[in-house]
Amino acid sequence: MRHGDISSSNDTVGVAVVNYKMPRLHDRAGVLENARKIADMMIGMKTGLPGMDLVVFPEYSTQGIMYNEEEMYATAATIPGDETAIFSAACREADTWGIFSITGEQHEDHPNKPPYNTLILIDNKGEIVQRYRKILPWCPIEGWYPGDTTYVTEGPKGLKISLIICDDGNYPEIWRDCAMKGAELIVRCQGYMYPAKDQQVMMSKAMAWANNCYVAVANAAGFDGVYSYFGHSAIIGFDGRTLGETGEEEYGIQYAQLSVSAIRDARENDQSQNHIFKLLHRGYSGVHAAGDGDKGVADCPFEFYKLWVTDAQKAQERVEAITRDTVGVADCRVGNLPVEKTVEA
């Protein structure tokens, strides 16, 4: 893991993250103009960072937040589509992989159902190699239709990459899911605003440490007329230490080199802090001393997760018993979310 240079090597993946200024757009023409601006920025960055293998732009950086519902549906894109064609051309010209936001991506039943909040990973040949749909939209504000799975893709120089989006990152489960599928770099694209800056910076660092993985965060900056976005895009080592972090500046960039061999060596040879290994080999020292085998205990000890998998409805009811049983809150209503209990069919 190295920071401070503009290079990369056969063993290091040069990763850049961008504090892209949150755009305020209203129509397809504006979206496509902004997509071309992102493409131009990427190509320019490659000149300044010749070692750059991967560049990451924030959530909402392409379309902005459409606060008008009609505009949200009217600007919802297809994948592939006009926006992705612009990004693919830039990836080819810059000979660089890119991660871009599509908010939203048309639902299969468009326009009868809300769009998805989607990230795409495009390789240096211009091919879309991963499409991730946000699993945990930022309720109650975000009205995106939720996705249902994470992915791992072999990226530049073989580094294994997963994508997550903004509020996804507040749930340890999604990080663990990516890591246990083999992700070595988890990319978190955000359109995160104040007041939750400190919590979000802390969460990404903690999850890098807990999952023995690299983390790259790209967050929006600026004010879009509604929210103020705190930036602080960052690249974090698999030991939880920050390699590089921007401030709040619009269009700020950070860059670091992530060693492929170093993370694989750590996962194979580290012991006391090898969290992903130890989780599935619980208490192996004591189990071995007892003569009960040399693998520790693999069984899941967490009753909640067992219940969630075997009876999701009962798990939901258990959560409601310690929180609330409606999605809306009577004392602070948001939209038309119900504040009286409803029964699902």
UniProtKB/Swiss-Prot annotation:
It holds the Pfam family CN_hydrolase. Gene3D superfamilies: Carbon-nitrogen hydrolase (3.60.110.10). This is Aliphatic amidase. Catalyzes the hydrolysis of short-chain aliphatic amides to their corresponding organic acids with release of ammonia. Hydrolyzes propionamide, acetamide and acrylamide. Enables the organism to use such amides as both carbon and nitrogen source. Residues 13-260 form the CN hydrolase domain. Keywords: Hydrolase. The lineage of its organism: Bacteria, Bacillati, Actinomycetota, Actinomycetes, Mycobacteriales. It catalyses: a monocarboxylic acid amide + H2O = a monocarboxylate + NH4(+). Coiled coil: none annotated. The active site is at E59, K134, C166. It comes from Rhodococcus erythropolis (Arthrobacter picolinophilus). GO terms for molecular function: amidase activity. Homotetramer.
